[in-house]
A protein has these predicted regions:
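Predominantly transmembrane beta-strands of Gram-negative outer membrane beta-barrel pores used
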Residues: 1-8, 14-60, 67-75, 83-87
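Outer-membrane beta-barrel domain signature, strongest for Gram-negative TonB-dependent receptors
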Residues: 65-171
Length: 171
């Protein structure tokens, strides 16, 4: 069993970070929201730029991924706390149909690979009241996943789709 916990944000001062990696960039915030530091925010967002790298390399597919997470926590008193959390992603893969003189391998991949869009998230809210001998915790949450695959004849969007798949799940 795995137990993962998001920590609270920094109650005393703003901290931020910009991240530039080989394939993505991101931003993180870790900060008080209220003057007294009882409400804090911890948040991050990341986005790939693989689509630009893959295009320069002449690859026939151009992926992009995005993900985010956050926790907004508020200490309502010595024994009470409220929080909101979220974690999610949205990704898509499109075909590089602008290749000049694609080779046989590129043509093969362009011929069968569909484009897709995918997203997922979980959001939750919780309330905690601490007693001397225990605690009361009330939590509500929602999660969802969407996956769409599609392919057009000869990769021409004015022609009919040969693949049109869409699934959505949520709890």
């Amino acid at each position: 069993v795995m137990d993962m916990r998001m920590r609270d944000g920094n109650p005393t001062r703003f901290k931020g970070k910009l991240i530039l990696g080989a394939s993505d960039f991101g931003i993180n915030f870790d900060t008080p929201v209220s003057r007294n530091g009882k409400t804090t925010l911890l948040a991050s967002y990341r986005r790939s730029y693989l689509q630009m790298l893959f295009s320069v390399l002449g690859l026939p597919f151009l992926p992009t991924y995005n993900d985010y997470q956050f926790k907004l926590a508020s200490k309502l008193g010595a024994s009470d706390e409220f929080y909101l959390i979220g974690l999610g992603s949205f990704d898509y893969n499109r075909l590089n149909t602008g290749l000049k003189d694609p080779d046989d391998d590129q043509k093969y991949i362009l011929g069968y690979l569909p484009e897709n869009r995918q997203s997922s998230y979980v959001f939750g809210a919780g309330y905690v009241h601490r007693f001397r001998a225990g605690q009361l915790r009330v939590v509500v949450s929602r999660n969802a996943f969407t996956n769409k695959l599609y392919k057009h004849e000869r990769n021409d969007k004015s022609l009919p789709r040969t693949i049109d798949y869409n699934t959505e799940q949520s709890d």
